[in-house]
Structure formats: structure tokens, C-alpha cells
């Protein structure tokens, strides 16, 4: 494994650890998810370019489309939660609480 792939994999792991550790606020969780999607995009693009997969050249674009949809839904959820509860705590999303 080259150093480029190791650094990209390390960025993915750091974003995953940030998502697992700092999950009190919704904004920090969304930021960690975006970091994970960015590292997946770079890893997929580098793999396709290095291995000359011409048929799979649309896969990073499709991943970016899904990342944009995920970001839009996450931000709309953030606005809804912050308007309803006044904060962006993730514990406000628990539907079982009274």
C-alpha cells in the first residue's frame, strides 16, 4: 500500500473516530460524515486512475451526488432540529423521550 492510500485511509479512520467520539452535536456529526465521504471519493478516484478502469469512471461522480444529497438532508434536519428545540444536540432526536 502506498503512502497516498495510507494517508487517505487514515483520514477515513480519523473521520470515523470523530463521528464515534464527538456525537453530542449534530453539526459535528455531519462534518465527520462529510470527511468520510471526501476520503472515500479521493480513494475511489485514485484507485480508478491508477488502475485505468475506464468503465468505472462515473463511480466517483455518483458518490459525489449521493454525498450532496446526504449533506442537503443533514442540513435540513439540522435546521429543523435547531428551530424546534433551540439546540443541535443529537439526544434531541430520540423519539422515545417525552
Swiss-Prot record:
Statement: the UniProt record of this protein carries the keyword Transmembrane: yes
GO cellular component term of the entry, any: mitochondrial inner membrane
Keywords, comma-separated and alphabetical: Electron transport, Membrane, Mitochondrion, Mitochondrion inner membrane, NAD, Respiratory chain, Translocase, Transmembrane, Transmembrane helix, Transport, Ubiquinone
Membrane protein topology class: Multi-pass membrane protein
Subcellular localization: Mitochondrion inner membrane
Superkingdom of this protein's organism: Eukaryota
Transmembrane segments: 1-21, 29-49, 61-81
Catalytic activity: a ubiquinone + NADH + 5 H(+)(in) = a ubiquinol + NAD(+) + 4 H(+)(out)
Enzyme Commission designation: 7.1.1.2
Function statement: Core subunit of the mitochondrial membrane respiratory chain NADH dehydrogenase (Complex I) which catalyzes electron transfer from NADH through the respiratory chain, using ubiquinone as an electron acceptor. Part of the enzyme membrane arm which is embedded in the lipid bilayer and involved in proton translocation.
UniProt protein name: NADH-ubiquinone oxidoreductase chain 4L
Species of origin: Pusa caspica
Name of the gene: MT-ND4L
